[in-house]
Amino acid sequence: MKTLPAVAGSLVGLLAVLSLPGPEPPVAPAPARGHGFAWNQDAFWRSLEKTYGDARAVGCRAADPVAARELSALGSAADRLLGTSLDPGAAVLDSVERRFFTLASFVAACPRHLGGYVRLSGSLREAIKWQSRRWDVAGDAARARVYRSLYGLRGAVEEVMLHHPDSVTALLDGRHEPSATPATTVHGVEIHSGDILVSRGGYPTSALIARGNDYPGNFSHIALVHVDSVSHVASAIEAHIERGVAVSTADEYLGDKKLRIMVLRLRADLPQLARDPQLPHRAAALALERARSGRIGYDFEMDYTDASRLFCSEVASSVYRELGVTLWTGLSTISGAGLRRWLASFGVRHFETQEPSDLEYDPQLVVVAEWRDAATLRKDHIDNAVIDAMLEGAQAGDALSYAWYRLPVARLAKAYSWTVGRFGAQGPVPEGMSARAALRNGAFSDRQSQIAARVTEAAARLTNEQGYPPPYWVLLDLARKERAASDRG
């Protein structure tokens, strides 16, 4: 009879030990060169909604000619930008940006010019990318200009698309950049070995990766393409949180939940490629060989200088760096105190790093094609707004908390995961992630999903009331309101 109390006492003692939280993870300081970007144009955004309402009121017969004139004028401006070098602070770039945003209101009201508006965005993106080749994109002025142009162009186009979801063209051509590396065609897009796929997953953590940046973006994941020179079979080399570096077929890559994908390619006129046109293929082959030669764990610390473990961006950057091409011209920075505290609780230790969204701004790369899932575009924008609102809360002191009694179970799950991992299996807690980090990750995802569900309902009601979907700044207002409500209750 004495055995039972002894066993019970031991179990209580074990539970108490497993429930001890331990010290909070260290939070690295903000990068010296980092600071958050802010548009500071709230009044202008609100005025665009009024312009849209006025255009609807006067009707397309009056609004269409205005849109046609601006499309033509901005198209001519894009042509001029491709031939005249400007400083990133040039006033003409501010003017083009503002006119493009204003034009969105007319095209949203009268969609006859939607196709032309989308093509114009591609022309302007090409012009800004060309301009940026001469800029110091690591400097504040150039970085802000490239960001507000490329991110802003996409945002304006998608606001228009959300007004006319049945007219959305999912696949948009970019620049047809020549390449000497092996190629294949996947869903109508010719991809070459060494191309880089930048995508956005459909999970709460995907939205956090995309938005958790001094320059909040649209993308959360990087994969490097390898095309076999004989069979022309395409593979994607990528790093997953759950299983580290892995090789996927094209179908497996596309089968994983994605809201958008962009294909990037090194410019053919780069000096490194002029000397060795097969350099991108050699980089892809090197990544493929390493991925198949042994397990490479996921780098939760986001240390882009250490190739012993890799996060998704490092899969591409590490092999290209070995061959003389340094990607992410101008490193990503994460400065917000609340965001750094949250990311540190997940295991991140480096806040000057390589964020997926920022690769688009590297002037060494061109956009070959861009695909977006029209059916989930609204979800993409709502997730962004919710994350932005949650990060405002983090900056104000919101913590990622979990019930204390879940910690012992999580630690046992971590021990189980470690054990099965020795035999090549995958447990519930990824290698390199602590039990507490896993609990906080789950708490974050649950809260984001709950707020997003309420914002989705509120946005649907507002759409029914006013006859058009709320723009992003209104979604952000709704997200702030729902976040505050969740804090209270």
Mark where each language-model region is:
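Cysteine-nucleophile amide-bond enzymes
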Residues: 2-489
